[in-house]
């Protein structure tokens, strides 16, 4: 770095980082286009709760982040500190919120113009890549997601 350049460091809490990711995705043209003209599927997860809150506000759709998760590992000290999970992913098709639906209900209808947001729960720092550790013995939500993403070229983003 030359003497005329400067750098700044910022400390973000986990919550602040999630809101930053959420605001960026809620402003992304491809994400908004999928929600308004095609199908946007946001899989339940703690980061995606912030993403959906920002998207729902932008799209004037109802949403409560409380319980927007499937598996939540809090450790023994906080085991009872979370709310019961919701029963549906956040799915918007052509601007309309599909209530009480999950990725399992819509995966077969997804195509190239559609978009899935599935939170990452693992990082490989050396390669700077995100990943998903699958806890279900039958593949969980990743199975229908992979069928859509690999088989029908549905776009997949790991916020």
Language-model-derived ranges and their functions:
Residues 146-150:
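Anion (oxyanion) recognition and catalysis
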Residues 159:
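Active-site rim beta-loop-alpha module in soluble metabolic enzymes
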Residues 32-37:
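Short helix-loop-beta connector
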Residues 50-51:
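Phosphate- and divalent-cation-binding pockets in alpha/beta enzyme and binding domains
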Residues 2-4, 15-27, 57-140:
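Ligand-binding beta-strand-loop-alpha-helix segment within the catalytic cores
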Residues 42-47:
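Glycine-rich beta-strand-to-loop/alpha-helix junction loops that act as flexible
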